[in-house]
Amino acid sequence: MIDEKLNKEKWSENVIIADADYVDKVAFDLIVNFERMIGRRIPQADMARWIDCVALDGGLREGSQETQVVLIHSKKRTAMDNFSPSDFESQLNGKAFSDNLGEFIISSLPIEDVVAADDMFLDVLAMVCRQDDVKRVMVIPDTSRDALCDNIRHTLRTVSDEKRVTVFAMQPMQGGNFRQEILGYSLMNALGIRAEELK
């Protein structure tokens, strides 16, 4: 069901799996709300900064490690509207960047017509969690879909305690065999919204 390339891939110790369409929508909502609140234009989110913030929230620390970033998106969408860089094929897929947290390798994965979006997300998550090499998984699903959240909880129930799994959501979720972080903090950082502006 999943792209054969993913099954054969050598996975890094650290993997970020994100529903790119959902993350883009949340970024848009934050831009609209905070522009009104703080009275200034907010630029597109910095993709590298957002990935760094997710990695830090997921427990990554400075070092020379490698992290794979899998952006799952609708086949109909060629780019994210509220991020820079944003084009899945020309600017993100197969690209990498390095900083004090190591190297980040980005893959964009369009949802094929033969599979439902939630099923594909769950398949990728389950496959990544089965890999012995993977030690840390950061998951950004569309948490507005209750059935998907239940299925993620079920999928992660049997994951080895040696793996550190963090699920990012806009509000706290019902607990499970994973840590939780609030997605909004990493997005606000990537959008350049400073804490002092919110006072």
Where are these regions (language model features)?
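Eukaryote-biased recognition of electropositive, low-complexity segments
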Residues: 155-157, 162-199
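A short beta-strand-to-loop transition that corresponds to the Sensor-1 phosphate-sensing loop
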Residues: 72-76, 143, 171
